[in-house]
Design a protein with these regions (language model features):
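Short helix-coil boundary/hinge micro-motifs
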Residues: 1-140
Length: 140
């Protein structure tokens, strides 16, 4: 598996991030796709289906990057309201941290992106959490 940055992974797959320093997601307007990176350990089974946390309302005030949250909220709304498809790329953290909101003293940092694939996913909002349910693997 090639170890590349999140920005390089997004660009290589046609997704433009608003700002590579604080953006958590990117958009491919031509293909009507939105890509989010999701944490590898922010997942659970729901009636036998794997799902990942894509975005959480609690993150708005749990991070020093409200720009990143607002940008991601705008992008998830493209999926919900404007017929864009959700894509998720799996990010492995340097260390696992609390779910869905990291504790104040926990490091939240990407070790690497799983760069050989991403998933096209359905999205469901439940109790303030946007869940991505992978439906199709896209090898890249």
């Amino acid at each position: 598996m090639e170890n590349i940055s999140r920005l390089k992974f997004f660009e290589r797959n046609g997704f433009k991030m608003t700002n590579p320093y604080w953006a958590w997601s990117g958009v491919n307007k031509d293909k009507k796709l939105v890509m989010f990176n999701v944490w590898e350990h922010f997942k659970e089974k729901d009636n036998g289906k794997l799902r990942y946390i894509v975005l959480c309302d609690a993150w708005e005030h749990a991070t020093d990057s409200s720009k990143g949250f607002n940008d991601s909220l705008k992008n998830i709304n493209l999926v919900i309201n404007d017929d864009y498809k959700l894509c998720i790329a799996i990010a492995e953290p340097t260390v696992k941290f609390a779910m869905p909101v990291a504790k104040e003293d926990e490091e939240v940092k990407i070790k690497h992106i799983k760069s050989s694939f991403y998933f096209i996913s359905d999205v469901v909002k439940e109790n303030g959490i946007y869940w991505g349910y992978p439906v199709k693997r896209v090898n890249v």
